A protein has these predicted regions:
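ABC family nucleotide-binding domain
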Residues: 3-158
Length: 158
């Protein structure tokens, strides 16, 4: 049995005439975390968006946990629940508290009970040393604090 959870083979993606992803190959092993880094405009976000099917790739194959990503999106919620992302812009909802930002996806995507999601969020907020800010809103925090909240939010999707 393979320990590969994400397999990307010869993936290509264009926006019009501009090829943003060219022959991308990548294997991610189960329980490993990776960082996709590179200069602005190099396709990092596009690659991640293809992995969770927010964007469609035009050539190649992407397999997540044994499910090949095709036009058939019946398993997409399960796949999205397994792919966590943290972006340079934190995209926290300004009208929600930090705690609510962290619990939103586990409750709506994973159907986790609210109390369990709150306990999980507090665990991860403690991990990034910002649990004392849980009831504040993003606009009340510094950029670094917002970044740590975004990391905790991604961790909440386990």
């Amino acid at each position: 049995m393979s320990d590969t959870i994400i397999q990307i083979k010869d993936v290509n993606k264009w926006f019009g005439d501009f090829q943003v992803l060219k022959d991308i190959n990548l294997n991610v092993e189960k329980n490993k975390k990776i960082v996709v880094c590179g200069p602005s405009g190099s396709g990092k976000s596009t690659l991640i968006r293809c992995i969770n099917r927010l964007e469609e790739h035009q050539q190649g194959s992407i397999i997540v946990d044994g499910n090949e990503l095709t036009e058939d999106t019946k398993n997409i919620e399960q796949i999205r629940a397994e792919v966590g992302m943290v972006f340079q812009q934190f995209n926290l909802f300004p009208h929600l508290s930090i705690l609510d930002n962290c619990t939103l996806a586990p409750v709506w995507v994973k159907k986790m009970p609210k109390k369990d999601a709150e306990d999980l969020a507090m665990k991860h907020l403690e991990k990034v040393q910002i649990a004392d800010q849980a009831h504040k809103f993003p606009g009340q925090l510094s950029g670094g604090q917002q970044q740590r909240c975004a990391i905790a939010r991604a961790l909440c999707m386990e």
